[in-house]
Amino acid sequence: MRIICLLLAVTLVFSCKKNDQPGPNYNSDKSRLTQLTDSLMNVYNNSVEGNKPGDYSVGARGSLKAALDLAAQVESGKFTQEEVNNAYSNLALAGQQFSTKLIQEVSAQYLVGHWKFNGNAADSSGHGHNGALKTGYVGSSAATATDGGTLPQLTADRFGRANMAYSFGNGSLIQVPYASELNSPSFTISLWVDMTSNSNGSYMISMNRWWGYKFNLNGTAVPFLTVATAATIYDRDAGAVNVAAGVWTHLAASYTDGTMKFYVNGELKKTWTNTPGAAVTLASPVDLSIGNEMPKEFYNMTDNSNPAYFWGASYFVGSMDDIRMYNKVLTDAEVNSIYIIEKDL
């Protein structure tokens, strides 16, 4: 009898507690959630997926939209303050994750020259290293040197867009005034080339040839980088790599004290680790040359003991586009990112 009474008492207590509990409080403040939803919806509506700086990675918009849809359900429905707060936190996290999907320019703070060749030779890096179209020498010696009389010509780029790249030949070049940030102890060069024909002197980009640095193709179309240091001059190549004629190819090379690297279409092809010393700073500034070894006015045509002596024309024949110059060594991943960003529209 005592057990039955105890059970009845417990039942009554729990029954009373259950009946006394208030229902969920749906009188919640959704103002913060609404503000965040509106803000991120604006971001979503103005975002584009793609592979260029300023785009978002493919699939990123779908993830954000799913989070926005869930938040909208909470805004329009009956939910407690705790549930509203959770929805806010989840949406804020989705917004933060979405921001990490923004494709940014590779090492923008170290990009000291970017010649996109979009109708002109202007530098889009923000550093003002604009190029000028110039003619260059042709001829096999100083005695036979003549002005080629040809300027670089706007041509179609690798996507077939007219006037979005430059073709070079007959000594033509783009001349960029000397600047110390283009003459860095460590650097990376990135560019696209479509070689028409090749020779030992296919200079793609150069600052004072052997006495500064030069990036060219050798006689078998192997990428070749020459860098002068205080102690010596290093000539290194990309190894068993031959650039094909008539095909747009992405090339990159980097140099720092002790290491030189070569890349083709975003892939590391060769690493040299026997190049100690920083790249030299030129004692007498020489302008940067794209498409030829050196601008005409910097040659010495009479004294073959002079480092600036003209030994014969060395210039690129073909088209180039999207040339980048960094005053640091990019990582392998960064070079590959440039290739990914630039290989498609």
PLM segments and residue spans:
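Amphipathic, heptad-repeat alpha-helical segments
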Residues: 19-78
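Extended recognition patches within non-cytosolic domains
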Residues: 66, 103-107, 320-345
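Short, tryptophan-glycine- and acidic/Ser/Thr-enriched carbohydrate-recognition patches
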Residues: 116-149, 337
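Low-complexity, glycine/proline/serine-rich flexible segments
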Residues: 135-183
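Glycan-recognition/cleft segments
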Residues: 178, 184, 189, 193-195, ...
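Short tryptophan-centered beta-strand motifs in secreted/extracellular beta-sheet-rich domains
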Residues: 189-191, 247-255, 262
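Short, aromatic/His-centered strand-loop micro-motif at the edge of beta-sheets
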Residues: 226-250
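Flexible glycan-contacting loops in extracellular carbohydrate-active proteins
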Residues: 274-317
